[in-house]
């Protein structure tokens, strides 16, 4: 992320995006493992729609990572949607479907995903000016950031 399309982008922005790309890559790995090896998946009987949603993350997580790495504003939007819906889906599975009480690994994981979602949504307005806009010419930034 230090050459090419990222050359003029501040180091802080590159670091935040790199962490986000790693989060989505990790999420991809987790969801692929859970899909291929069910013994590592949730130990609950999930409704069909929730199972389909979690399986779909094997597509949406890597797509968000690729779009973010390519500096596409669509990656920011998709990243926000994926993390927010993943936090909500895990919240439903953890607090509605799981009869366990107290602190559980599922609740810790759900809290982490929620924190990531809140953080990514909060950083998005700061990151957006450095991303390539979807409207207009390819290769142009959404707006020219002002140096202060």
Name the predicted role of every residue range.
Residues 1-148:
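Topology signature of small-to-medium multi-pass alpha-helical membrane proteins
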């Amino acid at each position: 992320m230090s050459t090419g399309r990222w050359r003029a982008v501040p180091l802080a922005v590159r670091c935040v995006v790199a962490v986000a790309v790693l989060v989505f890559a990790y999420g991809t790995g987790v969801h692929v493992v859970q899909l291929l090896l069910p013994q590592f998946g949730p130990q609950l009987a999930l409704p069909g729609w929730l199972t389909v949603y979690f399986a779909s993350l094997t597509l949406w997580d890597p797509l968000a990572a690729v779009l973010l790495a390519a500096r596409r504003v669509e990656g920011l939007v998709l990243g926000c949607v994926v993390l927010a819906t993943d936090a909500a889906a895990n919240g439903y599975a953890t607090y509605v479907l799981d009869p366990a009480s107290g602190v559980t690994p599922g609740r810790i994981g759900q809290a982490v995903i929620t924190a990531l979602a809140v953080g990514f949504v909060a950083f998005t307005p700061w990151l957006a000016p450095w991303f390539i806009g979807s409207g207009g010419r390819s290769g142009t930034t959404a707006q020219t950031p002002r140096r202060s």
